[in-house]
Amino acid sequence: FSALVAAKTLSFEEALLLVSLRAKFMQEAVPEGEGAIAAIIGLSYKELNTICQSISNEGSLVELANINSSNQIVISGSKEAVDIAILRSTEAGAKRAILLPMSVPAHCKLMKPASERFKVVLNSINMQEPKCSVIQNVDASETNNVAKISENLISQIYSPVRWTDIMNSFNQLTLGKCIECGPGKVLSGLMKKALKDTEIISLDEYESFLDKENLI
């Protein structure tokens, strides 16, 4: 959403409204305590996806929710299924399998009801054509098509965040510099490992914006 504000597709006020309602709808989609999220480190995409599909086929849903790197992936789903996935991931050789302190099982199919409610609100917003291309979580490809952007905003609620693919898109664009804006330096750390020839800068505090305001 911040990227869409920067691209002039959404106003700051529209983005605040959408982010607030999106969070509300996601929180209300699954009763508290029935969903869970966990980080799995040390298994490949294929290995972890096989585990999740096997558990889901047994009746309770768990899916890949955030592909941060080749061996650092977040899973999301019902509490029961995520607990089983943590156990099976550990048995399969994961270095770490940690339940995260989040009650909303984001980026999995349990969020489809939230996406339907969000769609109604989003359709009431008159989004503008972006001043520059944006790359979204769902397909990790460049677009300046408003209809596609809207479609992706809806589907990303229940679809995985393809961060590794996004970094690959950055790499193909041969960017000389990537700047992470926001709290923490997690994405900067991941980009430094993946984008060897790109300068990575993190602006995670107010003072850092003042120090580096002329970098762009």
Predicted regions and their residues:
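Short helix immediately C-terminal to the catalytic nucleophile in hydrolase catalytic domains
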Residues: 2-6, 188
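Acyltransferase/transacylase module recognition
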Residues: 123-216
